[in-house]
């Protein structure tokens, strides 16, 4: 429909489960067999046919689950600067007629991203003012579905969290984008790696007038295709995005109109055996964890 945004497409089986994450910190669990079959370019079935959801609550991410019995986490990030990881098996539900809490958000906060993460991966954080850093996924304690998580980043006065996502240490570069569609790539080794939470380093030159507002980050390989809609579909190879040092500004390899959107796709959770020597329990004492994090860094 006009004004709607495509989250992603993927192949699936009727025995799979689709988890949908929303801006208000909720999630819906939909068995694929409950989704109506349709033809190519059909508008499709509205979520309200199977799940009650507020019309103002917008879907941000989709994750396809083949099996909840896997050694992986779903990580959620809020605009209030919190981050949470919860084992995939905690997201399985018996009833799915309404949305459920995916993250306990504070007043005026939104959930800005939800994604799958695996052992030994890294989490990348970036603030709107352009500070960024990486840390190990193990730095986030596993907590329950309804917790608010822990502090993701130390922020300067007037700054706020823009984005958080997963990456691998061997990823060659990270793409950063601003609210007006400007972009740059930075070698991964230039992005500081440390313990959560920290402020990080600037990944762009700060201008006194019309400073850049960072809104998005993504690990990329040179041959990867980036698909944008503004509302026309535009495709750009990651290699066409300027590869610049941290101290430089952003480039404009593509002219994007207001309201542009980067196609994210649907995450498919891999099935990984849970190690027998690993404690995969969640911690519910989130307030104590959060207070402890405030003293770090």
Where are the language model's segments positioned?
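Short, structured "edge-of-domain" segments at secondary-structure transitions
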Residues: 1-297
